[in-house]
């Protein structure tokens, strides 16, 4: 089953934290979920050049806390923090609530699956050869410290008349092992011949085996203690 399901959803609540952390009554849930979608779509559309890998949202009664994980935080913050203040005002206008914005820098963007997928999509839009792009991307990701990489392209590759899939794998990719930290990213390349889907899986290693929820954050399920049997 781990071969088919989204690796992030497969691990969410067990070894991966939820990207949206809040509680709402049933009648308000739909509206708040739509707000989260609007925030993520707005950030991806306006700050594509900022290399945002993940957007986390936390809600309290008084405010909405938005945490941006970016490889280029300077693009979001701007000179003397002017850009981030403008962005905070835009988010408050979009949501109609007070917004607390926080920007965190990603230490190793080369092994972030979403950023790798977006980089491949940008190269395909610029008419780069897809096989050469796959080879270079896999080499750079493995050199950055990844334990394994899997990339799949789907569409009219190389301008071919018929769409097809091209897949390339390096290293280990234990998708069914929940202890394995598998990052997943997806992006679409809008080429002249049509859309090309880019899927990327990156094996970032194993979670701590004896952590007993040391890796889990608030809202996650801790590791259960071993059951003792009495004779």
Where on the chain are the PLM-derived regions?
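RNA-contacting regions in translation and RNA-metabolism proteins
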Residues: 1-231
């Amino acid at each position: 089953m781990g071969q088919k399901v989204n690796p992030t959803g497969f691990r969410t609540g067990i070894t991966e934290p939820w990207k949206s952390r809040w509680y709402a009554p049933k009648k308000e849930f739909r509206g708040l979920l739509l707000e989260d979608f609007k925030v993520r779509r707005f950030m991806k559309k306006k700050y594509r050049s900022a290399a945002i890998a993940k957007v986390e949202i936390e809600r309290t009664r008084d405010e909405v806390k938005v945490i941006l994980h970016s490889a280029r935080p300077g693009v979001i913050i701007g000179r003397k923090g002017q850009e981030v203040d403008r962005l905070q005002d835009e988010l408050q206008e979009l949501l109609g609530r007070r917004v607390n914005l926080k920007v965190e820098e990603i230490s190793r963007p080369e092994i972030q699956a979403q950023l790798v997928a977006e980089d491949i999509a940008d190269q395909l839009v610029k008419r780069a050869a897809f096989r050469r792009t796959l080879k270079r991307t896999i080499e750079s990701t493995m050199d950055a410290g990844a334990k394994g990489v899997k990339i799949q392209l789907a569409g009219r590759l190389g301008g071919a008349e018929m769409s097809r899939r091209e897949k390339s794998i390096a290293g280990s990719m234990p998708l069914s092992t929940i202890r394995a930290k598998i990052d997943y990213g997806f992006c679409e390349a809008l080429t002249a011949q049509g859309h090309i889907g880019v899927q990327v899986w990156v094996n970032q290693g194993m979670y701590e085996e004896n952590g007993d929820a040391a890796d889990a954050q608030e809202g996650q399920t801790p590791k259960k203690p071993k059951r003792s049997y009495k004779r």
